[in-house]
């Protein structure tokens, strides 16, 4: 279903997940769409790990996304939802946009379809879900935006389309993931078993020894 949503996009792809890991066929599809259908806008919203955003979206994957032709990337600290849609279908699911989850985990979700044909009914779950996540996206921290501004019709094709880039990576993403910040947040591994004497247990949250 996620595959169908990405492949079937004609105007927009909206990807919401706390964690992104770009590998495999889904990344290839997005690369292909960016090249073959550059007018399709791609919105990406990720979250969690404010002190170290690279745990949610690596720098390599961020750079891959930045290479796409029509892309808007934003960050919401408290994001935990997973939502994927194009202009006519949406998937609310437990699935992170992560290579391991996509290929190994047992996941579930609900598919919603646009009810544009039924303009009378008050029960329009696709539109309500889309509006909610769009509002969440617009309120989120901008990381990177690249869009294309069409040349004026009065230039008679003599002026190329203008690519507009708004890059906040260095002030937002980099600031949160610099070496000093990583050093502050680095924790020593917690031992759950020792080789000498009696075995000891430790709390996985605090690392305190459990008698």
Predicted regions located by residue number:
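HKD-type phospholipase D/PLD-like phosphodiesterase module
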Residues: 1, 24, 36, 40-129
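Cys/His/Pro-rich metal-binding microdomains
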Residues: 204
């Amino acid at each position: 279903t996620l595959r169908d949503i990405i492949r079937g996009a004609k105007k927009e792809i909206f990807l919401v997940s706390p964690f992104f890991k770009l590998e495999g066929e889904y990344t290839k599809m997005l690369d292909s769409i960016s090249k073959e259908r550059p007018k399709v806008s791609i919105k990406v919203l990720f979250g969690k790990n404010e002190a170290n955003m690279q745990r949610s979206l690596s720098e390599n994957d961020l750079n891959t996304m930045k290479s796409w032709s029509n892309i808007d990337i934003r960050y919401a600290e408290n994001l935990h939802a997973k939502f994927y849609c194009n202009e006519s279908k949406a998937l609310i699911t437990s699935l992170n946009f992560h290579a391991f989850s996509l290929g190994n985990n047992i996941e579930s979700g609900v598919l919603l379809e646009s009810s544009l044909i039924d303009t009378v009914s008050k029960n329009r779950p696709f539109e309500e879900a889309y509006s909610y996540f769009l509002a969440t996206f617009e309120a989120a921290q901008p990381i990177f935006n690249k869009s294309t501004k069409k040349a004026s019709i009065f230039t008679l094709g003599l002026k190329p389309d203008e690519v507009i880039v708004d890059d906040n990576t260095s002030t937002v993403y980099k600031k949160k993931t610099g070496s000093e910040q990583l050093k502050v947040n680095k924790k020593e591994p917690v031992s759950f078993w020792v080789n000498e004497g009696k075995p000891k247990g430790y709390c996985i949250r605090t690392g305190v020894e459990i008698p």
